[in-house]
From Swiss-Prot:
Isomerase is among the record's keywords: no
GO annotations of cellular component type: core mediator complex; mediator complex
Quaternary structure, from the entry: Component of the Mediator complex.
Name of the molecule in the record: Putative mediator of RNA polymerase II transcription subunit 14
Organism field: Dictyostelium discoideum (Social amoeba)
The family this protein is said to belong to: Belongs to the Mediator complex subunit 14 family.
Coiled-coil region(s): 1-43, 1382-1412
InterPro entries, per database record: Med14_N (IPR055122), Mediator_Med14 (IPR013947)
Amino acid sequence: MDQNQQQQQQQQQQQQQQQQQQQQQQQQQQQQQQQQQQQQQQQPPNGMMPMNGEQTTPIIPQNRNISLSLVIHRLVEQSYNSLLGLTEGLPKANDLERKKAIVDYLDGTREKFLRLMVLIKWSEHVPTLTKANNIIDILNLEDSYLREAADLLINTQFSLVNARAPIYDVPTAIDVLTTGTYQRMPTNIKRVIPPPPLKPTQIESALERLNDIIKYKLFISDVPKEFQPITVSDGKAHIFVDDEYEAYLTIDGGSEKSNWVILSLNLFVYSKRNLNGEGPIKVAYDNKMKYVLDRVQNRIISSAQPLFELHNIVHYLCISSQMDILASQVENLKKTILKNNIRCVFGKDQSITVFYWLPEDFNLVGVTQHTLGNLMPNKHTNFKIYIDEHQKIKISHYPPITHPKNENYFKIASLNLETILLQAIELNAYDKVYLLNSLLLDNRITANTTSSSSSSSSNNNNTASPIINRNNNNGKPNLLSTKQSNNPLSRSFHLNDIKLIMSSRFSDENQNDSNGNNDHLPTVLRVMLYGSKFLDITVNFQNGKFSLIKSSNYIEFTNHLEQRLNKDPNEIESIVNVFKLKSLLTCFEEASLFLGLECFNKIPLQMNSSNNSESNQLANELFSDSNFICVSISLAKENNPYYLVISIKATCFTPSFHLLFCKMLPKSTIMTLDSIIKLESDQLNKLLKECPIGSISSSNNTNSNGNGPFQSYISTLLEKIVEASNQKINLLSIQSFLKKENINYYQPSQQDIENNNNNNNNNNNNNNNNNNNNNNNNNNNNNNNNNNNNNNGNNGYKNNGITTTTSIVFLFNEQQIQKISPFLSNHISHQTPITISFKNGFYTLSFTQQRPFEYKKYGSGSNININSFGENNSNENYIYRKGNWIFKYQQTSDWFNSFCNDLMTISKITNISSQLLKQMETLEIYKQLITHLTIKPMSIEFVCFVGSNQTRTNVIMFVEKKTAEIKLSFQPYSNPLLVYLEKDINQSPTNDITNSLRAIINSNDISVYINSLISPLELSFYLPLEILVIPRSICQIRLLYKNLYGIDIKLISHEYCAISDSFYSLNSSKQVRLTSINQLHSFMEQRVSLQALDNPTGHRTSWLLPIKQFQKTISRIFIYLNSLNTLKFAQNLMKPNFQPLVPSNPSSQKFSNDYFIVSFSIRDYTSFDIDVTNKNLENSVPSNEELALFCQYFKKKVQQLNYRSQTIGSCIQMLTLPPKILWEFIRVLLEITGPKFDGYTIEISLNTSSIHSKNKESFFHIPDENQVYFILRYLNSSRTDIIPPDQFTDIPIIYNYNEKSIRYWNKLDSNSTSSSSSSTLPKKSLSIVEEVKQKFVEEVAKLIPDALNASSGKSSPISIFFKSFLPKIKPIFSNPTASTLLLIQQQQQQQQQQQQQQQQQQQQQQIENNNFASASSSIR
């Protein structure tokens, strides 16, 4: 125990020591802050040393520590928020995720609090660390001073370099000034001066003579034949050799015996494809061109035939350079994409052999750069570049191929090995593609001749001309031989639009040919398929194999077909047929997607052993090949899937259509085949025959008959097939549904439908007796057809034709009719046939009413029968015409339940209509009160007219389809009893409307008057939002005012009602929140003159009120309630500063303080009244008349609705002022309510709030500080281009009436309303506009003492202020933006400075004038 006590004492001592240390630290921090503030005031800016060299004490940095309590608070708050997040998110996660999240949260929280514990233990050393940090900061600051001093010294050194005087050229300046010239110019400058230029006539004559000499020398000399015609001009001879070189020559003398001199030599050794690029690509010899020119010049001087010598040398140089360039391009060629399929071999005769289209798996044994190895030039595809015996570069190709248009296709002029290779590949590819083209056209000719053999037998003498000539007269293939023939096409191969087209690869590579020749060849064979699709067959330029390019995605079988075509090109016809088949299936697939249907190539289908063998056999035949697609057809309320299978015959490309009925296996995605139907008919065969397949390849893609394009025709065909399938599926689904619901039905024939239509037309013209006879006849037919119902119910599954009958007839039994509605038997019976048909995505149900109900319009004068409904209204789903009903429902909806709901609606509306008509016949008063009655099948409309036209109400009764309940609608005003009226009708088993109808009539005028209170056209003494309407029963309404007072209204008749205080109702125990209305009985009996009714409680709380006086009476009651509420609010505000003089009274109250006696009361149960008198009768400031004017001013303000509570609060705050100060404010109020001041209206704002809660009042008084806080408002009602109308600005000020001073009131600053000694919160910065206002207030406040002295105390400081502030208000109104306000302030400052300067100047001038006058007078 002793040890425990010692430990406790030690802990207490440690805690005391820690507290003392903390107090010392706080004191040190405060001292440091004070020192910092003093040093900041004395220290120069930016931490620089003072200019006078005096050293100041360094700035001690502020304490950058964070409070430990703040750290603990933040850590606990973060942990708590994380825990809240876990509670919200973990219930949605699984068990493993919840456990993981909880463990992560616990680990993280534990780690944070461990760190916090370490931080708490370490916090004991914070003072030492803070001192160390301060020392480091001081040392860093001193170090920065030293560095800045050193930098300034270095900069000074650099700036003094140029601070020296220049050396002046004195001798030159003396010469120029004395003699006017410079005599020291050197004599050698004459050598640099050029001689005078020749004249143009001399130059022209010299050039003409030189041209004549050169022409004569060429005439007598031998010229090589390779030269182009030589041109002579400007003393030069221009020599040009195609694709080799050009040279400019002249002579070195003035006679024909002079030697030739080469002026320039340009070799054309570059690629022509670079002409439009950077220009000619020079060879490696360009660097030694000067050396070459010297050698050639020496050779032609010593030669007897200098021009031949020039040509031989330069020609050999060009040929060698060209071969060297081609050889150098071999390495670049190996870096291209063709590097694995080409080999280049250099021969001993300087030839270059390029082998291309080599297989990638070819074994190159012994092949090097200079040996062929196992490559054989006579077997493998290659071309060879060599120099012939005439010293010309030639190109040969194996196998031998020639261009169909250009014999000299291979030219070395391009000087590009890659271009030559591409030309060879292009020509070889054209030859291979042309072979396929010939095979297809030969097969087409054979098919045409065999198909037209019967027609040509009669014309044996006439021989048919061939469609295509493989070779022309020159033995070259004809490029124009791919035109389509006009002969009839074979059914098995009818899409023969074949053409050769250019490949973008080769045309882009060689787009810049010389001389603009276009020698490109078509290397793509395009075969048109169905629709807009096509098949392109080309040759792979890398390996020389055929490649298939598709316009659709057929990757799964394209590779296999390419292999077949490369093995045997004769397979081209079968390959094209495969693509034709797939393209036709693609057309149907795109058409199904266009129609919004899903398309499948495979479906998980399992054959059902219970089905017949024919269905299984037909399904196996359909799915044996891949020439089919499955289109999914889904209908609403159908769980079993339906598929439309479109299959194409490979021999004739004719589509066939089958409809599959499937069933889903339980808990599986596999389906079983229920049945299968082949859709075929004469109409379908006709559509297939009209298919425009023969003209798909035309440019406009239309047939000769003017039909649409092929794809749109396929879409139309598929749409009709899907429509027929939907009709079949709908027929079967309706049959199964009716069978499931045990509803008798039968499917009528086409003749029965026509007979029924004729009978319906006859029924519309006959009377009711004929209608009954026709119904009996129809019933006999129904009974006969029902006997065959079970036999014919499933015939649709086995019928191979498309069903044309799209209707079913069914009949309800008695139990089903009673289940829908007990009133439905008045419309249909168990013998009434109901026909359902489907078309265009809608179900249409029609029947003839058993006993037609008369729908009428009952007006004031006559009644009009209505024979038809819904024909002109697209929003309604029914049509009624003389007893015949037609209902229309979408297939996606639950049509049967919707139909039953509509039948129930018709029966209920008929029942209510009958009750309403019976009430009007029984009670004569209803005929007067209910007018313009319209009875419709789905609703009832009438006008309730009780009093004047202002209370006319349109009432609509209808049945809501979702809840099957009767609803009411009132226009133009809603009835407060709507909920109880609907409840009363729907709770009645027979939908009795007696009580509801009586309540509607009795509450008609009252509901209109109540709506006028809630949404008035003009504002009154109370706000509409302060009134709450609560229905209590079918004949009682409660009106609440601010949840304090309540008025109960009980309906008695359409002429009288009873109103009472809700506080004294029978359920008063539940209304503990309500307050009794004081002296309501006196108000009702004296002000309204109503007599009280008997009440079980013995209080006079209920009065009988005529409805004609309802609106006026209720409005007076709420005005009285508003006055009571205002009086209660004023009493609460008076309690802190005033003492009550008499006991509390709800209608009046009197208070007093040291200066005044204030009484609040309600005058004549209407208006709120204020009365103020001096407590000291001897005090005449302010006088009773002035106090009366003060009360009258505030009465007017209180009557305004806006900020009424703040107005009362401001009035009470004014009454706390001393009498003399209040007298000043009264004088100001009287003064500002007079005329306008320069177009401005001034008032003390009583209805302005602030953001801060303590400063929300616009006027309040703090007696301890002798200060009044209020706002001066300046309003401008003028209309100009600069000032908008009704603009105002507020100037918040603080008036110290003891010091007679005024300063600006910052309403955003919470410290402005408290003493400066207790202000601890930081001050909030003002906006630019408020800063300008503050400066204006300070400027005007400085003028008040002088103005007070000048007025000798007759004017108050407030009156002086608002008058003096007017010049400052004008620029604020005209320039309301912050930037312009600053400019105005600067301008005013400049104007003041200018005025001061002018005054000083005037004073100086006056002094000088006075001195001058005194001096002149003394002289005189």
